[in-house]
């Protein structure tokens, strides 16, 4: 257990101490004299033995030497070969000592693993991992530790574990777990465990009962799994284990057919005698020796949890070894026999058929159905033979080749497998199922109504299994044994009258009993006599019609069918394993051709060419999901509008894709007017049209007003000449329209007059036009370009505190950057980026619901009497007694009465076999927690994938820093108060409460778990009167509400959730919802700051934007020239929100330049760049991006995309200034003329 010391010197042979010599030695015992030749041979033998490397053999017992007839000559080397020494004794093979790594793991396991004691023996183990003690739930007993035994353990039945927190004194001395499990070998108590293909396996025979709870360790002594059980798979044993995934969530991996490795022995009962279930007593011993007693033993232990062990022991007969484990499963059905039952359609009419169809199940994918019949397959009358089938030929059992069997729907089916009462076939779609066989010239068939459909997997409706594609979860029927949870109910057959046992002998009715059988008879001549006989018996009746004889068959079971009469008295039940059970598997589904994608400005065009109907779903990643869902059946083209918030589309079985729009354009915001108009029209068509219409209206109004004013001025000028007859208007006056021959005061005189008489009016007259012009121009300038100037104040400024607080958007992948400033220290760069966010609500499982199965036991037929119903604890149990259903001496019951015969029909509901893999869980959702995984960098410290709670209270240690995040600005969740989880999808659905389900709707079958006994059902089950003369139990029932809900459930939450939420399970959560913002507060330690004297001082900064593409992911490149006091590193940051800098810091020389990348949404970015303690402003022009649609979100805000370029503003000023000139000139001319006329009149 402990490491051995290492020798640092050559090993030496041990030195023997000097032997002790007695001063008075005893006298030697007398020994017989050996001849000299014998002494020489003995010396030679000893010499050869000493030369060998093997251990010396013990000396033979002393005795007289062997007598020889002739003295042997002197030994020679050749003779030495003939006289070989006796073979040396073999060394006892010692186990190799474990290596250092193994010894370390063994010591860790022994110190942290505690036995669980039950009745004085070890029943399993409990281990202490990560501050908790884990105990297998199936292991009964008490932990052999006083402190751990006093802990109150919590049960986690889904993981088959019990767990509890260890005392504080033991928390520092516990094992640690890990989720890293690379393929290879790991350490276990019994040796190496191989991990490959996500499975832990050991050689067969290693480990077994009593090893449940032992941990599996890696080379560092960390726990990678806890063993719960195992199952033999050929030469290796697959282990059932509990592991942890990358997120620290417990995961249970249980191979099919695994058995818990608890050492406790379960006891069974037979005639008030208890015995181990795997060792039945010698009286029944096994089925071959005592069939009836064995069946009785199984029936009495029907509800035992070790029924499988008892059944396995009864079939194997203990001492008898089977060839393979699979044979045990096949030989189980030797306990049963075929039977004849009612068939609704035998090809011509209703009949009692030897291959009646009991049930058809089509819950698997790819058109595979499972058919249960009254015939048996894979068995002959004398044993197991997969090439044969057996059926009841009248009263006897007959076997024929399986090649005579056929199954068809709308076309012949392909036989996949068969065993027992079951057939597994892959059939084409159809409305009926027919099973039949040929027995020489006889042809037997049975047809029932059942709709068979090809159920595709995924989001594509293909009709045939593809050769290649993508693997998706699906349902299949297994071809091998499943030992738990799926049984077919059996019972000993009822009595059926047999006319062949009755005959007339000496005018009396004689009952002939077959050898080794028993016959029950019932005679009425005229007194009623009945009894059981095992030998021939002669009655007093004279007519065969007066007697009935029943052959008692208590050596075989038959299926508990509603088409067979039930046996008399208390009929016990047995059960056998269903050979083909539904399981979760992986199926290959088709993959539709990739769509041809075409990008335009804010438009995504998909050219789709499906081979079969394919589902296309889309949703917006903003606050309004606006989901769409359509099946595409033929080649088509669809268009979708894409915004900066993003769009997600899913085509068929392809994974979802997300795209985002970029602010691209066709024109040039820095070009000629028509290019500017084209650019803005492509981006903002409505705004551009309104702006152009406004400009045109201004121009038209300006021109009309100017012309009107000029015409008005001209009229004022020429009016005096119009009043004078034959007046000649001078040509110059006609042209200028304002010159008159009379003299008047000019403008200077008028201004002089106003200055001398009314100075206030002088200043008003002079300044009002100028003020109006300035006000108009300023209003226009503020309207078009002052918006960005206002928004420039938004952004994260450097924090001048040791504790930095800020608010960052709740968007995964968008980093928050800032410079944390502290007096006397150089600024420290801070970056926080969300890697993952999770909204985890608290849930309460109300119930699970699934498809139900109607169980119809064999009816009770009472001849010449009445029976009554008794209540039974079955869900939706129905019982009813019908009278007068069998005619006189009818073949099924052979009653002597007519109207007095009665039948008691029963029916109830239970879970279908598919419930274990196909069920929905109804949860109530309450307020939960928000968690985030962040990457944080401050200074030279970088911390990856730190998990924090977004609640504003719980601090997280990030190195030496303390971080507090939250709470979210919006208390929002995509989950309603009630959700339904089905498979890997989640649905918001208002389900009924437990115990209030309605027939035909969701929740018509409810239970707390998939195996609990608290089953509630409401299926509107009604029993109907059976048809006279036919043993059957007709009933009506509402269709399954679970199946109806599956058809009408709509789109899952993953396709309709807003804000781009991704819904996941285990636990139920919403990931990466881009909603609201997150406050952050971080305390940065002093060690992250550097004295300002130790950092470079930067001066003479000059920034030039060399290349810039706005609205693109870091599409801007700028170069900064500088001079530095010394070489070193400086953080760079832009405190404004105009640009986001990609680099966090730069390396500076004493002089030179450096280049950085930035991302911006402004076409004229002007942002402040801070380098160490200095700052510089970077300005430039940006061109639009070429890509309209990209597959990554923007790394900047979109607050500045509406800004007008400087070039566009210049053209606008020219346009507005040109049109205003006409108005100004007209106003000036009008004003001058008005003044002239005013002064002329006065």
UniProtKB/Swiss-Prot annotation:
Residue ranges of the region described as Functions as an uncleaved signal peptide for the precursor of protein E3/E2: 262-273
Sequence intervals crossing the membrane: 689-709, 760-780, 781-801, 1219-1239
Organism domain of life: Viruses
Covalent lipid sites (S-palmitoyl cysteine): 717, 737-738
Gene3D superfamilies the UniProt entry points to: 1.10.287.2230, 2.60.40.350, Alphavirus E2 glycoprotein, A domain, Alphavirus E2 glycoprotein, domain B, Alphavirus E2 glycoprotein, domain C, Tick-borne Encephalitis virus Glycoprotein, domain 1, Trypsin-like serine proteases
Stretch list, region Binding to the viral RNA: 83-113
Ranges where the record places region Necessary for nucleocapsid assembly and virus assembly: 1-36
Membrane topology (Extracellular): 325-688, 745-759, 802-1218
Sample GO molecular function, one term: RNA binding
Post-translational modification: Structural polyprotein: Specific enzymatic cleavages in vivo yield mature proteins. Capsid protein is auto-cleaved during polyprotein translation, unmasking a signal peptide at the N-terminus of the precursor of E3/E2. The remaining polyprotein is then targeted to the host endoplasmic reticulum, where host signal peptidase cleaves it into pE2, 6K and E1 proteins. pE2 is further processed to mature E3 and E2 by host furin in trans-Golgi vesicle.
Segments for region (Transient transmembrane before p62-6K protein processing): 717-737
Motif Nuclear localization signal: chain residues: 67-70
A single BP term in Gene Ontology: proteolysis
Region ranges (Disordered): 1-103
Chain ranges of the Peptidase S3 domain: 112-261
Comment on protein domains: Structural polyprotein: As soon as the capsid protein has been autocleaved, an internal uncleaved signal peptide directs the remaining polyprotein to the endoplasmic reticulum.
Misc. comment: Structural polyprotein: Translated from a subgenomic RNA synthesized during togavirus replication.
Protein name per its UniProtKB record: Structural polyprotein
């Amino acid at each position: 257990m402990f490491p051995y010391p290492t020798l640092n010197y050559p090993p030496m042979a041990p030195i023997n101490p000097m032997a002790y010599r007695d001063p008075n030695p005893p006298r030697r015992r007398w020994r017989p004299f050996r001849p000299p030749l014998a002494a020489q041979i003995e010396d030679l033998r000893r010499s050869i033995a000493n030369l060998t490397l093997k251990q010396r053999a013990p000396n033979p017992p002393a005795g007289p030497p062997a007598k020889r007839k002739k003295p042997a000559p002197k030994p020679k080397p050749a003779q030495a070969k003939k006289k070989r020494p006796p073979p040396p004794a073999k060394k006892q093979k010692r186990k190799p000592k474990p290596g250092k790594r193994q010894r370390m793991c063994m010591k860790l396991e022994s110190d942290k693993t505690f036995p669980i004691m039950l009745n004085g023996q070890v029943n399993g183990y409990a281990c202490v991992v990560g501050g908790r003690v884990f105990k297998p739930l199936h292991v009964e007993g008490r932990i052999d530790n006083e402190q751990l035994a006093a802990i109150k353990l919590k049960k986690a039945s889904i993981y088959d574990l019990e767990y509890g927190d260890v005392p504080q004194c033991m928390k520092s001395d516990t094992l640690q777990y890990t989720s890293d499990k690379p393929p290879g070998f790991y350490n276990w108590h019994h040796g190496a465990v191989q991990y490959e293909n996500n499975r832990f396996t050991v050689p067969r025979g290693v480990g077994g009962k009593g090893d449940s709870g032992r941990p599996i360790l890696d080379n560092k002594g960390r726990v990678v799994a806890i063993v719960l059980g195992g199952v033999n798979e050929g030469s290796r044993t697959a282990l059932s284990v509990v592991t942890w995934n990358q997120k620290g969530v417990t995961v249970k991996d249980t191979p099919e057919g695994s058995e818990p490795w608890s050492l406790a022995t379960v006891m069974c009962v037979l005639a008030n005698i208890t015995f181990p279930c795997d060792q039945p007593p010698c009286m029944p011993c096994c089925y071959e020796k005592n069939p009836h007693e064995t069946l009785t033993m199984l029936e009495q232990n029907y509800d035992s949890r070790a029924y499988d062990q008892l059944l396995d022991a009864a079939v194997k007969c203990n001492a008898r070894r089977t060839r393979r484990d699979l044979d045990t499963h096949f030989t189980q059905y030797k306990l049963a026999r075929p039977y004849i039952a009612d068939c609704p359609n035998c090809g011509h009419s209703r009949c009692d058929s030897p291959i009646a169809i009991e049930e058809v199940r089509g819950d698997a994918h790819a058109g595979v159905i499972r058919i249960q019949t009254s015939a048996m397959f894979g068995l002959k009358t004398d044993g197991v033979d997969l090439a044969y089938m057996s059926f009841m030929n009248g009263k006897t059992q007959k076997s024929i080749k399986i090649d005579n069997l056929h199954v068809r729907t709308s076309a012949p089916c392909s036989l996949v497998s068969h065993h027992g009462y079951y057939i597994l076939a892959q059939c084409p779609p159809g409305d009926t199922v027919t099973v039949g066989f040929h027995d020489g010239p006889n042809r037997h068939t049975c047809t029932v109504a059942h709709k068979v459909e090809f159920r595709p997997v995924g989001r594509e409706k293909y009709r045939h299994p593809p050769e290649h594609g993508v693997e998706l979860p699906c349902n299949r029927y297994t071809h091998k044994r499943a030992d738990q949870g799926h049984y077919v109910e059996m019972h000993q057959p009822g009595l059926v009258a047999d006319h062949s046992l009755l005959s007339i002998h000496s005018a009396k009715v004689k009952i002939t009993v077959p050898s080794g059988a028993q016959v029950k008879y019932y005679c009425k001549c005229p007194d009623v006599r009945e009894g059981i006989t095992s030998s021939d018996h002669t009655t007093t009746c004279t007519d065969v019609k007066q007697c009935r004889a029943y052959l008692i068959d208590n050596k075989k079971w038959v299926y508990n069918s509603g088409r067979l009469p039930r046996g008399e008295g208390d009929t016990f039940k047995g059960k056998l394993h269903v050979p083909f059970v539904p399981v979760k598997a992986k199926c290959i589904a088709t993959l539709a051709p990739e769509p041809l994608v075409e990008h335009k400005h804010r438009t995504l065009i998909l050219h789709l060419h499906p081979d079969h109907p394919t589902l296309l779903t889309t949703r917006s990643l903003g606050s309004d999901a606006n989901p769409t869902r359509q099946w595409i059946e033929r080649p088509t083209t669809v268009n979708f509008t894409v915004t900066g918030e993003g769009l997600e589309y899913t085509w068929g079985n392809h994974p979802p894709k997300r795209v985002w729009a970029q602010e691209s354009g066709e024109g040039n915001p820095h070009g000629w007017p028509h290019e500017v108009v084209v650019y803005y029209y492509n981006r903002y068509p409505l705004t551009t049209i309104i702006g152009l219409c406004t400009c045109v209206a201004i121009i038209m109004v300006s021109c009309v007003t100017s012309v009107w004013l000029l015409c008005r001025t001209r009229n004022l000028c020429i009016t005096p000449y119009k009043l004078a007859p034959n007046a000649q208007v001078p040509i110059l006056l006609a042209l200028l329209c304002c010159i008159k021959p009379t003299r008047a005061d000019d403008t200077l005189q008028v201004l002089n007059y106003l200055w001398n008489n009314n100075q206030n009016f002088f200043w008003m007259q002079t300044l009002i036009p100028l003020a109006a012009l300035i006000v108009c121009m300023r209003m226009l300038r503020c309207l078009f370009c002052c918006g960005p100037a206002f928004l420039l104040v938004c952004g994260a400024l450097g924090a001048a505190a040791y504790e930095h607080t800020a608010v960052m958007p709740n968007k995964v992948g968008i980093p928050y950057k800032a410079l944390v400033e502290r007096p006397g220290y150089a600024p420290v760069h801070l970056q926080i980026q969300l890697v993952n966010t999770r909204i985890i609500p608290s849930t309460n499982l109300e119930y699970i619901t699934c498809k139900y199965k109607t169980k119809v036991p064999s009816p009770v037929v009472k001849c010449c009497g009445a029976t009554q119903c008794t209540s039974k604890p079955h869900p939706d149990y129905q019982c009813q007694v019908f009278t007068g259903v069998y005619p006189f001496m009818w073949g099924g019951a052979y009653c002597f009465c007519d109207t007095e015969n009665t039948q008691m029909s029963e029916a109830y509901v239970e879970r279908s076999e598919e419930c274990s893999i196909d069920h929905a869980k109804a949860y109530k959702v309450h307020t939960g927690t928000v968690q985030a995984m962040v990457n944080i960098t401050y200074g030279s410290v970088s911390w990856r994938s730190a998990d924090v709670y977004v609640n504003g209270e719980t601090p997280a240690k990030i190195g030496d820093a303390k971080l507090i995040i939250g709470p979210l600005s919006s208390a929002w969740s995509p989950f309603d108060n009630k959700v339904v989880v089905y498979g890997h999808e989640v649905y918001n659905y208002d389900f009924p409460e437990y115990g209030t389900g309605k027939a035909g709707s969701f929740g018509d079958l409810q239970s707390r778990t998939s195996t609990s006994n608290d089953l509630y059902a409401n299926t509107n089950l009604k029993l109907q009167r059976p048809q006279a003369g036919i043993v059957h139990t007709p009933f009506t029932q509402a269709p399954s509400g679970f199946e109806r809900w599956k058809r009408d459930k709509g789109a899952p939450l993953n396709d309709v959730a807003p804000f781009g939420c991704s819904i996941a399970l285990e636990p139920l959560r919403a990931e990466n919802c881009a909603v609201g913002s997150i406050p952050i507060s971080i305390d940065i330690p002093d060690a992250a700051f550097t004295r300002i004297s130790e950092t470079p001082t930067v001066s003479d900064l000059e920034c030039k934007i060399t290349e810039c593409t706005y609205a693109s992911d870091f599409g801007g490149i700028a170069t900064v020239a500088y001079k530095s006091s010394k070489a070193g590193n400086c953080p760079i940051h832009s405190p404004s929100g105009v640009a986001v800098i990609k680099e966090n810091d730069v390396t500076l020389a004493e002089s030179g330049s450096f280049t950085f990348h930035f991302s911006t949404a402004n076409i004229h970015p002007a942002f402040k760049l801070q380098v160490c303690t200095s700052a510089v402003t970077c300005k430039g022009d940006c061109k639009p991006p070429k890509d309209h649609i990209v597959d990554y979100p923007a790394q900047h805000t979109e607050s500045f995309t509406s800004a007008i370029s400087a070039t566009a503003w210049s053209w606008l000023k020219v346009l507005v200034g040109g049109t205003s000139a006409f108005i100004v000139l007209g106003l000036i001319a009008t004003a001058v003329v008005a003044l002239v006329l005013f002064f002329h009149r006065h």
